[in-house]
């Protein structure tokens, strides 16, 4: 099991120098990859290009590029450029974001998300393979049929023969799509106890493409806080989990609350949402059951975290994308180092 580090959103509570120090320390410690996110602040590719110029061996991934933010052709152009600049170290992670960001920020309808994702990934793959892009799907047609557009192919070649594409997915149908079209799955709120079900969904999609999961990378993003004080470690996790389960999306459409519900915490997730959407963030965090926190994070004493790492390996995780969670940069570096020791 390879270790990755999630940097999250650039500039959100950390400086550029701190982000760079974290990545360079991860590279020194032998971490396999560093991942950068985007929402409606910093963009991921600019940060990734900056990191590529200041690192030498660590792989760099988008976690994720938002599908509504770019045409598939622009995503392929960006990915190929980053792969060349990094010397073949780029991993392309894609995700739909959510209806609030897609429609409120990017002006893109969130309708037919499965069909749109299928069309998008198919065109990105065609472009990265330097095939002439002539495609007719349910939500996308290239070239447009009623104008002067012509089928084009990418004029540059990625450094890697097959640039790996990862899909962020949570629901069963999206997982199957990842298994069918992608090289890896970016999981979130990942439970090792439910890994068998995840693998079944991924395998069903892979079978549609006439393949199995051999070489497919299961790569969940997992929050980490190592501390001898278990209660304090759980409390570090509460604001982050409450944000996603309670506040990411609307009451009617929150993928993270849905995931908690699939794990058997539907009532607790509803309580977290009630508090969070009413502005009671501390109460939202307090409503998170300890059992849910332990299920989807690595937190607590070293022995407990070591057991969690073993469970993730047993669950078939190929790349564990860790998010060292702490209130200061110094503490984040400490978490990064401690985890490397425990995973060795």
Where on the chain are the PLM-derived regions?
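Active-site-adjacent structural elements that line small-molecule/cofactor binding pockets in enzymes
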Residues: 1-344
């Amino acid at each position: 099991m390879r270790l990755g580090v999630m940097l999250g959103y650039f500039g959100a509570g950390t400086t550029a120098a701190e982000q760079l120090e974290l990545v360079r320390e991860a590279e020194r410690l032998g971490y396999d990859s560093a991942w950068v996110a985007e929402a409606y602040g910093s963009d991921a590719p600019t940060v990734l290009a900056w990191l590529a110029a200041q690192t030498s061996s660590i792989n760099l991934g988008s976690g994720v590029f938002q599908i509504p933010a770019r045409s598939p052709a622009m995503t392929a152009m960006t990915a190929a450029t980053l792969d060349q600049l990094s010397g073949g170290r780029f991993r392309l992670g894609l995700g739909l974001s959510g209806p609030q960001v897609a429609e409120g920020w990017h002006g893109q309808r969130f309708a037919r998300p499965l069909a749109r994702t299928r069309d998008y990934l198919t065109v990105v793959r065609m472009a990265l393979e330097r095939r002439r892009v002539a495609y007719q799907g349910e939500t996308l047609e290239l070239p447009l049929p009623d104008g002067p557009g012509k089928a084009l192919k990418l004029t540059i070649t990625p450094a890697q023969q097959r640039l790996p594409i990862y899909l962020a997915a949570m629901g069963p149908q999206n997982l199957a799509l990842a298994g069918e079209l992608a090289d890896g799955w970016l999981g979130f709120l990942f439970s090792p106890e439910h890994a068998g079900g995840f693998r079944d969904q991924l395998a069903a999609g892979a079978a549609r493409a006439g393949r199995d999961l051999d070489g497919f990378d299961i790569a969940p993003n997992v929050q980490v806080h190592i501390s001898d004080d278990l209660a304090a470690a759980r409390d570090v996790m509460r604001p982050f989990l409450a944000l996603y389960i309670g506040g990411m999306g609307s009451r009617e459409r929150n993928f993270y609350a849905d995931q908690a519900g699939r794990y058997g915490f539907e009532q607790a997730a509803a309580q977290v949402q009630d508090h969070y959407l009413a502005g009671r963030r501390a109460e939202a965090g307090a409503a998170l059951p300890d059992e849910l926190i332990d299920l989807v994070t690595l937190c607590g004493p070293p022995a407990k975290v070591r057991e969690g790492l073993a469970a993730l390996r047993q669950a078939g995780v190929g790349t564990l994308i860790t998010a060292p969670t702490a209130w200061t940069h110094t503490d984040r570096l400490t978490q990064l180092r401690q985890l490397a020791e425990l995973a060795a």
